[in-house]
Each structure stands twice: as C-alpha cells, then as structure tokens.
Amino acid sequence: MKSCEVNFDGLVGPTHNYGGLSYGNVASQSNSQQSANPREAALQGLAKMKALMDLGFTQGVLAPQERPDVSGLRRLGFTGSDEQVIEKAARQDMPLLVASCSASSMWVANAATVSPSADTADGRVHFTAANLNCKYHRSIEHPTTTRVLGAMFADAKHFAHHPALPAVAQFGDEGAANHTRFCRDYGEAGVEFFVFGRSAFDTRYPAPQKYPARQTLEASRAVARLHGLSEAGVVYSQQNPAVIDQGVFHNDVIAVGNGEVLFYHQDAFLNTDPMLNELRDKLGRVGGQLRAICVPRAEVSVQDAVRSYLFNSQLLSRPDGSMLLIVPQECQANASVWAYLQRLIADDSPVAEVKVFDLKQSMQNGGGPACLRLRVALNDTELAAVNPGVIMTAPLYETLTQWVDRHYRDRMSESDLADPRLLSECRTALDELTQILKLGAVYPFQLN
C-alpha cells in the first residue's frame, strides 16, 4: 500500500496581529505593536498551500481558533455580554485582551505531535494535542485543537486522539516543532526523534539561562508512551541551551528532518555525535540509512539562522527520491545563508532544489514555512478516511481566498482588537469556514 506525508497548513485567523507575546522569539518581540495585515497573511499562507498542491504534494488545511477568546476572559473574571467582556478587558487589562486575540494557532507545528500507524503499537495514527503551557496565549489553544483534529481525523478505526498533557511546567509540550520522524519510506516503521530543552526532574541536564526551554524531556517521554512507541523506535536529544538563549525557541528553528535526512546547524544539539550514532543505529535496524547534513557555524552563524529561518523550512520528498527545500524569502535576503544554499544544491546532497516563498506576515511574528504546517504520514486507506473537506484542491483554494477577501481586514493594530465588531466579524467568518471545511461544530460559540 502506498503512503505519503501530508502537510496540513494552519490557516491564519482574522485577528492576526503583532502582539509581541512570545518571549524568546526574537522576531515576535522585535515587531511588537506594528500594524499587521490579516488578509495578506492568510493569502500568503494559502498561496504556499496552493503552490505545493500544484507541485503534486498532498496538502491539507487546519482551521484557526476562535478569537477573541471570550470564554477565557470569562474564566479570568470578566462578566457581562460578550461585547461587554471585551470592552472591560480592553479598559482594565489590554495585554490580556491582546493575548486573547492572538492568531498564533496558525503555527500548527505546535498543534500536536503525530505518530504514524507504522510506528504505533495498535497500528493507528496517534495525535496528542500540545499543552503549550509556556505562554498563556498558546495554552488556551489545545481544547479547540483537539476538537478540530477530531473532526478532521474522525475514524476511530484509523486515528487515536489524546488530550494535552497536564498543563504544568514539568510537562511543557510544544508539539511537532520539537519532533521529527526518520524513515526509509513513509509507510514503513521509522524512528521518532524527540528534542527537549530541559529536564524537569533530572538536574544533570543543563538548561538555558536567558530564555525559557519550552519542551521537557518528561513531556516527550509521556507522548511516546501515549502513542505506543517502542524504545527501539525512539531517540531523545537535548537541544543546545546556548542556542535557546540566542532565540532558538523550538528545535524547528535550528534543524529539520525528512525521510533519511537530518539537516541541522552545528550548534543545534548537545552531545551531537552520540545522538547521531543512536539515530543511525536505530534507523539502520528498520532498513534506513541516515544522511546528516551539518551546516557549519563558520558558514552560517546561529544569528543568521534565526534571522533567516533557514531551518524553519520544509524538506519535502519528490517522486524521484530527491528533496525540495521550501524557505522564506528572508533566506534569499541573507548573503551567507543564500550562498550556503547555492552550495548545498550544487553539491551531491539530497537537496536538489530550493523554492522561496513570501511569508512576511507570519515571519514578522516569528513563524516560517515549517511553523505553518503539521506533518501527518498516512497510507492510502488512512488518507481516504480523512475528512475530505480539509484536503486542498483548486476549487477549495478559490473558495478560501474568496472567503478571506470577504471577511478579513487589511489592517490590525492593538486598538482594533477592542472593536466590538471584530468579535461578530470573526464568528461569522468561522461559522462559514466550518461549513466550507465540513468540520461541524468545533468552536466555543457554536457549542454554547
């Protein structure tokens, strides 16, 4: 049976703004309080989805969250009608309202960790929604994420859904942004690679000093247990605390993997050689051969990697066995990064081509191509069981671009978030979206 890896990209929500909410994410903080363009952001994301579909890749779409999060504001003590709740929050605690309007769910690499059926004990695809407990604006996402994923992957014969881990620092979980799977073929057993920033309970592991390490070893181990992964099919590796302190808040900012290839910066990991040996050995036992591409710090600094989001790229397998690297245009604008990429494709490397995309609206908020997608490896039977409404087609692309043009504003600043009309605009848009994507009732306003 054939298998493929499907990229489900996050659709940017109508409240996209530059709130500067993510301490440790350099781009997010440096662009704080600039005016954003939600319409342009959503269209840029859709253009990437359409382009990959046109290249022959199976492409899906993941719906945004309901924002402003009125129910969350009510839990924090604001009362009255929905409009009054927003008005009071704007008057009494504007930073909280900004957090409650975040469109950060667009970065669906943080939505969940996914293990394909070839790796799991029960032969189903497993999903665990990430608790994202490091930041309030992201910690409120997982209940809706769980419902949306449940509506997309509804057949319990093929798909298993786990609730988020306990929302405490010891089990901080950031989803697939710290998880990669290596395999010879998507339908064969592989090795799942979990990267953590610190250990909650074992003081032998170092930790960053400036910025928080968002993923714990304990969370990664818990997800592996929930998914029924064997020890022989899992490798845990610690991210270098020094690069976290330079703005590498997730592993997908400093490394990317696909198939048998790990593309990483020289400073990405602690204890790199033992990690590579374990990965090479375990992948070899399931018929694979690891190809590690190390980018030397002498050619690309960590600072340039973070500025350009070189590693927050998509590494995609083409039918001929070569790979395509999808990068943001910031890579082209960075001389050392672009020079390195030209050498990479000229050398005898698996990466045969680099394609550049304009994702400026997302990039300025701290998310590149890899942040915007959740990878799900599926065989033909499982793919047929996915809700067909979320698989990108030319007609769906046209429908969604028209939907964005109808409902999204072209400017969003902090003061706009207090506009009581924004709530009704967003709910009208999302109600229509659930019909377009055939999701049913997934949003709080639809369930109440």
Swiss-Prot record:
Enzyme Commission identifier(s): 3.5.3.23
Q: Annotated pathway, please? A: Amino-acid degradation; L-arginine degradation via AST pathway; L-glutamate and succinate from L-arginine: step 2/5
Family note: Belongs to the succinylarginine dihydrolase family.
Report residues binding substrate: 19-28, 110, 137-138, 214, 252, 365
Subunit and interaction comment = Homodimer.
Question: What keywords sit in the KW lines?
Answer: Arginine metabolism, Hydrolase
This enzyme catalyses: N(2)-succinyl-L-arginine + 2 H2O + 2 H(+) = N(2)-succinyl-L-ornithine + 2 NH4(+) + CO2
| Superkingdom as given in the UniProt entry | Bacteria
Gene, per the UniProt record: astB
Please describe what this protein does: Catalyzes the hydrolysis of N(2)-succinylarginine into N(2)-succinylornithine, ammonia and CO(2).
Q: Does the keyword Hydrolase apply?
A: yes
Tagged with keyword DNA-binding: no
Specify the protein name: N-succinylarginine dihydrolase
User: Which residues are annotated as active site?
Assistant: 174, 250, 371
Q: Which GO molecular function annotation, any one, does this entry have?
A: N-succinylarginine dihydrolase activity
Q: What general EC class does the enzyme of this chain belong to?
A: hydrolase
Q: Name one GO biological process term.
A: arginine catabolic process to glutamate
